[in-house]
Design a protein with these regions (language model features):
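Generic short beta-strand segments
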Residues: 52-58, 89, 134-135, 156-158
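Acidic-leaning, charged glycine-interspersed low-complexity segments
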Residues: 25-26, 104-162
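Oligomerization/assembly interface segments of phage tail-like spikes and tubes
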Residues: 74-93, 146-161
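Extracellular/virion structural assembly segments
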Residues: 75-81, 89-117
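Short, charged, solvent-exposed linker or helix-capping segments at domain edges/interfaces
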Residues: 61-62, 97-99, 163
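Charge-dense, low-complexity intrinsically disordered segments
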Residues: 1-5, 98-102, 143-145
Length: 163
């Protein structure tokens, strides 16, 4: 089978990894992990979106980008740099933005720790994180339903596809 891109398999792997990890999806309290945009209107206090740039958008969102270059003699071997967009979000019914900012930072820290600790090449989908966690944009707000803090970040990987 020809592999056009590692993006779909890598997103699937990350969703499973984060959902089952004791510091994220299996934590107490758990972080709800979404593969892309949520399919429910329910707000969860701690959320990690994989393959999403803006949880508030009703428009189609970019989940990832990839760039390929030739990696070897011949036509088949290519290196692929994959960037997967993610958002960590913490929300509560209280007015304390500070506690939500700390909670969002905790989700990001747990993701970064997993990125550094993986020894499986992320299920065989990559050569290495390049650099792994990159470009974090922090935002916060206090709304009529409570305080919210977000950290939008990119996960960057290098993989080899083809021959």
């Amino acid at each position: 089978m020809t592999v056009t891109s590692r993006v779909p398999a890598l997103i699937d792997y990350l969703v499973t990894l984060f959902t089952n990890d004791p510091t994220i999806g299996a934590a107490t309290p758990p972080v709800t992990v979404y593969d892309g945009p949520p399919v429910t209107a329910l707000n969860t206090p701690l959320t990690l979106y994989i393959g999403l740039t803006d949880p508030d958008s009703d428009a189609m969102e970019s989940m990832a980008e990839s760039q390929q270059t030739w990696a070897a003699l011949g036509r088949r071997g290519r290196d692929e740099i994959v960037t997967i967009h993610c958002v960590a979000e913490a929300w509560s019914g209280s007015d304390s933005v500070q506690s939500q900012r700390v909670a969002a930072a905790g989700i990001v820290a747990a993701v970064e720790t997993l990125m550094q600790a993986d020894t499986t090449q992320f299920g065989g989908n990559i050569l290495f994180p390049d650099p792994g966690m990159a470009v974090v944009a922090w935002s916060q707000n206090t709304t009529s339903t409570g305080a919210i803090a977000r950290a939008a970040f990119d996960l960057v990987f290098k993989s080899r596809i083809g021959g």
